[in-house]
Amino acid sequence: MLIVADENIPLLDAFFQGFGEIRRYPGRSLDAASVKDADILLVRSVTKVDRQLLEGSRVRFVGTCTIGTDHLDLDYFAEAGIHWSSAPGCNARGVVDYVLGSLLTLAELDGVALPERVYGVVGAGEVGGRLVRVLHGLGWKVLVCDPLRQAAEGGDYVSLETILQQCDVISLHTPLQRGGQHPTWHLLGQAQLAQLRPGAWLVNASRGPVVDNVALRELLLDREDVHAVLDVWEGEPQVDLQLADLCTLATPHIAGYSLDGRQRGTARIYQALCRFLGVNEQVRLAELLPKPPLAQIELDASTDLSWALATLCRAVYDPRRDDADFRRSLSDDPQQQRAAFDQLRKQYPPRREIEGLAVRLHGEAPQLAQLVSALGGVLV
């Protein structure tokens, strides 16, 4: 059996060497010739997998180590009898850590208290739903917009217009849909961006085209009160340099790039392939994940809640480092820019998640205990 895989997928040998030969390629350069003789294709979001890539090949299973599937032509898969699997939720915790780290940075810049802001989460799937639970656990006011879940479940959801008009912070976590009843391509265009409240913060860690990048650039040129945090870009790996300069935080699509999340994504498609082939799983992710470098954090019962929040979040991740690395890589040469974008992702340093972080409290501190629990830490 021949497996063709994106070279940036972690733990390929550990999970898949038992199935046959593995050939690695840069994800953006995968073409029909590369996959012609493959039985299994393993990709990330940078590879468009459609009829043009697969027609005439032997591929019968496609696995993507991502939450999103907008790069997969699922209609063609159905027509051609190709089985597929994604990795829903694999990097959700990493994205939540990214958002929390970004909020801490913006709060320090603006001199505001995070508990006093109103938060709007657009898209309450694996990532957005987890973010909502964390924010609720912290006791912060959260409004949620998700028309698909609202139609299916009912519940306390609000419209996008309500989010824009009432929320100080808006975090986007929708898939990219160009058609259908609820398209998300340019979900925030010129008209929607114009409705942002004074001093609003906008975070996009979903897909670049969910926000009209040209309209956002024009807004930021006109409104210095608005902060934008972008991890995803229209046309990436090419980046609008002026927009990047106007963003308060700018990063190269690494919000979900925690070590745990990336390896979890590989494990998910391995499990799906085992089911497809009807074989038992022989490899367990828990046996492959290294121990976190930070074993435990200790807090005194008198610790200020804001200080504790910042300390716990930044103990595992601080987006300012990635922002600085990204800005140093920006170039007026388009080819150099694209290469630098992908290189930052390929060589991304190990980053762990806050979930499961051991925290010891010295003394009775119910509010601190609640904060630790909300963040996903473990009291020891």
UniProtKB/Swiss-Prot annotation:
Record-listed E.C. numbers: 1.1.1.290
Compartments, record wording: Cytoplasm
Annotated positions binding substrate: S45, T66, Y257
> Pfam families, alphabetically?
2-Hacid_dh, 2-Hacid_dh_C, DUF3410
Q: Cite the entry's keywords alphabetically.
A: Cytoplasm, NAD, Oxidoreductase, Pyridoxine biosynthesis
- Per the UniProt entry, what are the Gene Ontology biological process annotations, in alphabetical order? 'de novo' pyridoxal 5'-phosphate biosynthetic process; pyridoxine biosynthetic process
Q: Which Gene3D superfamilies match?
A: 3.30.1370.170, NAD(P)-binding Rossmann-like Domain
Q: Does the keyword Aminoacyl-tRNA synthetase apply?
A: no
Q: What does this protein do?
A: Catalyzes the oxidation of erythronate-4-phosphate to 3-hydroxy-2-oxo-4-phosphonooxybutanoate.
Name-wise, this protein is: Erythronate-4-phosphate dehydrogenase
Q: Which organism is it from?
A: Pseudomonas putida (strain ATCC 47054 / DSM 6125 / CFBP 8728 / NCIMB 11950 / KT2440)
